[in-house]
Amino acid sequence: MRFIPRERAAQTIGPCNVKIQAPVGFVTGCHAGDKFMVQATLASMKHFCPTIPICLVVDGTFDVSDLESEYELIVLRVSELPSKEMRKLMSGNGRAKLAAMWEGPFEFYVWADSDAIVWGDFTQAVRTDVDFQVFWSEISIPADATEVPPWLPHFYFDPQKLSRFDPEFDWRGNAYFSSGAFACRREVVPFDKWMEAESWANETPGLFGDFYEQPLLNYFVHSMTQRGEIKSAMTNLQDVWRHHGFDELKQDCADSNWHFPKTIRRPRVAHFCGRKPLLFDWQAYSRPFTIARLEHHRRQHGELGAWLAVLNEERRVWAGKFQRRLQRAIGKWK
C-alpha cells in the first residue's frame, strides 16, 4: 500500500487527548549526545521523502529549535508527556522511542533510530494495511527448532522464563528484528499491557535482554500476532551492515562524490548500530551516514562549511571519548 500523507484536520484520540496531526509520518528521536547524528537522519528523510511529515522525540531539555525550523518538525518531548508513569519509563533510556506509540502525532508511522538513515524512497513498500511491519530480512529461528540459540536470551528473551507468563507463546519461526527501524499503528501495544510485561522483568532477572525496548517489542509483536490480536508483516526494509554486509551500500555510493546517490538500487533504512558511524572510526562503515551528515550542513553552510562542521563534530566526539577514558583511568589509580 502506498505510504502517502493526506491532509486532514487534527483529531483528538487516546486517554491523554493527544492530537493526531497526520495519518502517516516518520518518527526519530535523540538525546543531547546524539543530536549531531539525528541531524543526518532528518536530512535523509527530507531528501528522499520530502512530503512525509516528521516527528522528533526529544529525551532531555536541550534546544532543538534549529532542527524544528529546518525540517518543519513536530517535537514530542519525553519530559512533557502527560503521564508520570510514561515519563519514568522512558526518560534517559532507549525506551524514549515508545513516546511515539502512545503519545505520537501520527496514526501510523515509520520509526528510525538516530543512527539510521532513510536510503532511498521506500514508501511504496510500507504496509499501512497491517498493525505492525517488521523491517527485517529473514526468519531468525526455524519453526521446527529444538534448541534455543544463545543470542535469543541475550538480545531478546529467555523462552523458558517467559513460558511462566505466556505458556502458549511459540518462540520459533519468528523474525527477530532490530528495533532501530519498523513501522506500526499508534497504540499497537496498549500501555497497560506493556507495563505488565515490565513488571514480569522486574520480578524475573534475565527474562528479557538488556536492550531497552527491543526485547519487549519483539515479544509483543510476535505473541500478539500469534493470538490474532494484531496483523503483522515482514518486509526487507532494514539494512544493518554488520549483519547484512555493506556491498550494496558501497555500490550505491561509488560515484556519488559524498552526495546522496541519484539512484538507490534497493531503497530501505540503513541502520548503523553498534559502533557510532563516525568518519574517523576505521572499524565502522560510515560513508552513507557521513553523506547524510554533510547533506544536513550543506543546507546552511555550503560544501566547505559542511565539511568543516562535520570535522568539528568529530573533534568534539573524540575529545569527549578521550576525556571519559582519562577519567576512568584516573579513577582506577586512586
Residue ranges of model-derived segments:
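Short, acidic, metal-binding catalytic loop of nucleotide-sugar glycosyltransferases
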Residues: 44-52
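Active-site-proximal specificity loops/subdomain of glycosyltransferases
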Residues: 62-104
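A conserved hydrophobic helix/loop-capping motif in glycosyltransferases and polysaccharide synthases
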Residues: 25-31
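Short internal beta-strands
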Residues: 54-59
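A glycosyltransferase accessory/donor-loop signature
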Residues: 1-23, 169-173, 186-334
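GT-A fold catalytic core of metal-dependent nucleotide-sugar glycosyltransferases
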Residues: 98-149
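Conserved glycosyltransferase catalytic-site signature
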Residues: 38, 94, 98, 116, ...
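Conserved catalytic core of nucleotide-sugar-dependent glycosyltransferases
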Residues: 128-192, 196
